[in-house]
A protein has these predicted regions:
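Bacterial N-terminal signal peptides that target proteins for export
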Residues: 1-11
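Bacterial N-terminal signal peptides
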Residues: 9-21
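C-terminal PAP-associated
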Residues: 25-523
C-alpha cells in the first residue's frame, strides 16, 4: 500500500519529565492506591487545541511500542470565536454551523513511543487532506497480533461549508455532511502509515446486510467508531452508531424551521425513525478489505442503543446489552441483560440470559446514575471465559463465565466510589496473560474527577485498586475544552507488565490527554 511519512512537529522527540516538575501537586489527603504506584503526565493538547476522547494500544510484538490518539479540536476559532452553550437556540445553531465549516477545526493527533513512554514522536492525521474534509474527529487507535498499529477517525464534512449544502438541523449538525469512518495501518511501529481506507462510509446502504435499514442523516450510522481485535484470529472490527428506519417506515423530508435561514430544518421528533443501533464491520486481512455491515443486536432481541459491550476472542464476537425483549424460548422476564455470541462477524447471534444482580446488592435508591452500561471483556488465554462488570449505585460488580455464558459466577465487588461520587469513563480488558484490568473516572458533585484502575490476578475473585491520577482534575473549562466537545470516553490497555490509561484531564489549564502507566506488580 502507498505510504505517507508521519509528520513530526519540528521533528520533535521529547523526553517527558516527572509530573512534579511540571505542575504543582494538590494537597489531597492520602487515598487508596498510593500515588507513587503510578506514573502519569500530560501527553497531547495545548492551550490552542485540546485533546480528548483518547485511545491507547500497545504492540503485542513489542510491548514498548505504544500508540495514543486523541481528538484535537481548536479551543478558539481563527476569527476569535470561543465556545457558547450548545443548545437549540437560533444563535447556538448558527454558531455551530460556523464552527463545523472551519477547515481543520478538529483533527486526530497521534503519539507513538518505542521505549515504553520515555520518549514520544508526534504527528497528525492525513485523512482530512486525503479525503478533502474539514474534520477527523472521534479518533481511535488499535493494534493487531501481527504487530500492526492502526489509527482512524470519523473524517467528515466536505471542505469549507460544503458539508452544509444539503442543509442542517436545529442545533447545527449538517444533514448530509459527507465522509464516514476510515482507518490506516502501520507496519513499522508507527513510523509510516498506509493511505486511509473507508470502513463505514456515509450514504452506502449497499454495504449493509439486506435486512437492515440504517438512517443516513448527520453522522449516523457511523458515529463514534470503536476498535475491537480478536488476537487469536487476527480479525479486527470497527463499530459505528446511529438510527434506523422501521421495516415499513418511510422517512419524510425534513421540515424547514421558520426561525432559521434557508437551509435550516427542524429536528426530527421522537417516533419519526426506528431504533438506535451499534453497527459493526469485520476485516480478516488487516484492514485492507471489509465485510458486510451488521449490528451488535438483532431484530429478535433488540438493544437500547448505547450501553452495551463488545469483545472478541477465539473467533467469537461477543456482545452484552440490556433488552426489553427476551430471546425466543428463554422464558425470561425482561428488561434483562443478554449475552450474545456470533461466529459469523455479527450476522447472527445465539443468546443467553445473564442472571440479574441480587436484590441485596442494589442500592435502596437509584441515586446519581453516572454512566452505567455493562462492560464486557473476552479472555484471550481461555476460550469461553468472559467477564462482565455491572454498576449498582456506588459499586461495580464483576461476574465471570468459564463456559461461554451458560453459567456465571456470583458477582464480586470490584470497585467503590465515595458516597457523593458517580462513575464515568469505565473500561475493562484482559491482558495477554489473562489478568483482568478495569479503569474508571470518579466524578464528584462539583464536576471534578480523578482516574482509577483496578486489577484482578486470580480470574476475577479478588481486586486491587491503584489511583492513577496524582491529583483531582478541575471541572471542565469551557473556553479551553476542545470547543466543548471531546470528552466522551477514556481507554486502557494492559500488557504482561503494565496497565496503561489515557483520559481527558484539565489540570494543565485546558483539556489535554494524559497518559498513565501502572506496573502490575503494584496491585
Amino acid at each position: 500500500m502507498k505510504q505517507f511519512r508521519a509528520y513530526l512537529a519540528f521533528a520533535t522527540v521529547v523526553m517527558l519529565l516527572p509530573l512534579g516538575q511540571l505542575i504543582a501537586q494538590s494537597s489531597l489527603p492520602a487515598l487508596p492506591g498510593d500515588n507513587a504506584k503510578s506514573d502519569e503526565y500530560l501527553l497531547l493538547g495545548n492551550a490552542d487545541r485540546g485533546a480528548g476522547e483518547p485511545w491507547v494500544f500497545f504492540n503485542p510484538r513489542d510491548p514498548n511500542n505504544l500508540i495514543v490518539t486523541a481528538m484535537a479540536t481548536l479551543n478558539v476559532l481563527p476569527d476569535g470565536e470561543t465556545p457558547v452553550a450548545h443548545d437549540n437556540s437560533v444563535q447556538a445553531t448558527l454558531n455551530r454551523v460556523h464552527e463545523l465549516s472551519v477547515p481543520d477545526g478538529s483533527r486526530t493527533d497521534i503519539a507513538v513511543t518505542r521505549d515504553g513512554g520515555k520518549t514520544w514522536t508526534f504527528s497528525e492525521d492525513n485523512f482530512r487532506k486525503f479525503y478533502n474534509k474539514n474534520r477527523c474527529s472521534d479518533s481511535f487507535a488499535g493494534a493487531g497480533p501481527d504487530g500492526a498499529l492502526y489509527m482512524g477517525c470519523l473524517v467528515y464534512l466536505d471542505r469549507g461549508d460544503g458539508g452544509f449544502k444539503g442543509g442542517y438541523f436545529r442545533g447545527g449538525e449538517a444533514i448530509n455532511p459527507g465522509g464516514g469512518s476510515a482507518i490506516a495501518r502501520s507496519d513499522d511501529e508507527g513510523k509510516t502509515w498506509s493511505n486511509p481506507v473507508w470502513v463505514h462510509p456515509l450514504k452506502s446502504p449497499e454495504l449493509y446486510a439486506p435486512w437492515l435499514r440504517p438512517l443516513f442523516e448527520q453522522v449516523g450510522p457511523v458515529d463514534r467508531p470503536n476498535f475491537i481485535v480478536d488476537a487469536s484470529k487476527g480479525t479486527i472490527y470497527l463499530t459505528g452508531t446511529g438510527g434506523s428506519l422501521g421495516k415499513d417506515a418511510v422517512l419524510a423530508p425534513p421540515v424547514h424551521d421558520p426561525e432559521l435561514p434557508d437551509g435550516g430544518y427542524k429536528r426530527r421528533e421522537a417516533g419519526q425513525t426506528g431504533g438506535f443501533h451499534t453497527y459493526i464491520r469485520a476485516s480478516h486481512d488487516g484492514g485492507k478489505t471489509w465485510g458486510i455491515i451488521y449490528t451488535t443486536d438483532s431484530e429478535q432481541v433488540p438493544g437500547r442503543g448505547f450501553g452495551g459491550g463488545v469483545s472478541a476472542a477465539f473467533g467469537h464476537l461477543v456482545v452484552v446489552y440490556t433488552t426489553d425483549t427476551a430471546p425466543p424460548s428463554s422464558n425470561a422476564t425482561c428488561p434483562c441483560t443478554v449475552f450474545g455470541i456470533s461466529e459469523n462477524d455479527g450476522k447472527s447471534y445465539s443468546y443467553k440470559i445473564i442472571p440479574a444482580l441480587p436484590a441485596n446488592l442494589l442500592p435502596p435508591s437509584p441515586g446519581p446514575a453516572g454512566r452505567a452500561g455493562v462492560l464486557l471483556a473476552a479472555d484471550p488465554t481461555k476460550e469461553g471465559r468472559y467477564a462482565i462488570a455491572r454498576t449498582a449505585g456506588r459499586r461495580q460488580y464483576v461476574s465471570i463465565t468459564e463456559d461461554g455464558g451458560n453459567t456465571w459466577s456470583a458477582p464480586v465487588l470490584a470497585t467503590e466510589v465515595p458516597e457523593t461520587a458517580t462513575y464515568s469513563h469505565r473500561g475493562m480488558k484482559y491482558s495477554p496473560a489473562g489478568v483482568l484490568g478495569m479503569i474508571y473516572k470518579a466524578q464528584y458533585p462539583d464536576r471534578t474527577f480523578d482516574m482509577w484502575s483496578v486489577v484482578s490476578k486470580d480470574g476475577g475473585h479478588n481486586f486491587s485498586t491503584v489511583r492513577v491520577s496524582h491529583a483531582v482534575s478541575p471541572a471542565y473549562i469551557p473556553v479551553r475544552g476542545n470547543f466543548m466537545y471531546g470528552d466522551d470516553l477514556s481507554t486502557m490497555d494492559i500488557s504482561r507488565e503494565y496497565l496503561y490509561v489515557v483520559w481527558g484531564d484539565n489540570r494543565s489549564g485546558f483539556e489535554g490527554t494524559w497518559f498513565g502507566k501502572v506496573p502490575l506488580s503494584a496491585y
